[in-house]
UniProtKB/Swiss-Prot annotation:
Residues reported in the UniProt entry to bind S-adenosyl-L-methionine: N36, L38, G63, E84, D111, N132
Protein name, UniProt field: Ribosomal RNA small subunit methyltransferase A
Main location per the UniProt record: cytoplasm
E.C. numbers: 2.1.1.182
Organism (species): Treponema denticola (strain ATCC 35405 / DSM 14222 / CIP 103919 / JCM 8153 / KCTC 15104)
Function per UniProt: Specifically dimethylates two adjacent adenosines (A1518 and A1519) in the loop of a conserved hairpin near the 3'-end of 16S rRNA in the 30S particle. May play a critical role in biogenesis of 30S subunits.
């Protein structure tokens, strides 16, 4: 391990050593933050291999925890900004990484969902957005970046496998949701690795998967981004109902009156279709038509 660090990093492959470290420092695992440590070194190295990292590449890491991935990233010479909410981990990360990595490592304390956009506005976008996301915030965080209209060149997130399947689902798939549509607007998304529960400590009750997001070279055109987001969510508001019922109800509640038949006629779509059968283009078309009413 690098002797230049203020506190030597622990053996990230050893649950016993990690547990001992936590107990020695008096840290309590905060279940509300969904902490699970990736103890399989080959998996950690494999995840890094999916990223194009050069010296000076700007990387954001979400939820570094004890710093297992942080250590590997800094070894690559990247300029790393880590977002961590747990006060105990913040204290430890400072002792391990901050003392002699001030030019390459920045630690942002607090809730990433509140901090990422203000930090981006002040410091600009990174090349890579990366993390082993706590299951309880994964979907919300990714959706918030899309809904803000912010597109990263590359994102790689390890999430609950179920969430990964929703992100990468295509029309007609049972896992296809509003979240799938939002992710497909700006990114080509694919599951690059399935990770068993045994690779983590403590073991979660579910499998995980790493999802690679690569920004599309060309984005689909849209006239009103905020309206598009609202309509996607409205169309999936009740999966058992067809698009005429879901969209018609939303239009009446949002000042568009009883014009659903006109919208469907202009779109060429059958009102009997359900949202899970619509492609990205169909959602964009419907939002453009409604935006011109």
């Amino acid at each position: 391990m690098n002797s230049g660090f203020f506190l030597s990093p622990p053996n990230y492959d050893s649950p016993a050593e990690l547990k001992s470290l936590l107990e020695t420092l008096g840290f309590a695992m905060q279940k509300k933050f969904g902490q699970n440590f990736l103890i399989d070194k080959k998996t950690r190295e494999n995840l890094i291999s999916f990223l194009t990292l050069d010296k000076g590449t700007r990387v954001w890491e979400v939820g570094p925890g004890l710093g297992a991935m942080t250590y590997l990233l800094l070894e690559k010479g990247v300029h790393l900004t880590a977002f961590e909410i747990d006060k105990g981990f913040i204290s430890l990360l400072k002792k391990i990484f901050l003392e002699n990595s001030k030019q390459n490592f920045t630690l942002i304390e607090g809730d990433v969902q509140k901090n990422w956009l203000p930090y981006l506005i002040e410091h600009g976008k990174p090349n890579v957005f990366f993390g082993n996301l706590p299951y309880n915030i994964a979907s919300d965080l990714i959706a918030s970046t899309v809904e803000a209209g912010v597109v990263f060149d590359t994102m790689l997130f390890t999430v609950q496998k179920e969430a990964a399947e929703r992100i990468t689902a295509r029309p007609g798939n049972k896992n296809y949701t509003a979240f799938s549509v939002l992710c497909s607007l700006f990114y080509e998304c694919k599951i690059v690795k399935t990770i068993p529960a045994s690779a983590f400590w403590p073991q979660p009750n579910v499998e995980s998967a790493a999802v690679l997001f690569k920004a599309k070279k060309e984005f689909a055109e849209y006239k009103n981004f905020k309206l598009f987001i609202k309509i996607v969510k409205a169309l999936f508001s009740s999966r058992r109902k067809n698009i005429k019922n879901n969209l018609g109800s939303w239009m009446k509640s949002n000042g568009y009156g009883d014009k659903i038949d006109l919208v469907l006629e202009r779109s060429g779509l059958s009102g009997n279709l359900r949202a899970e059968s619509l492609a990205l283009y169909d959602f964009l078309l419907l939002s453009d038509i409604i935006g011109h009413l």
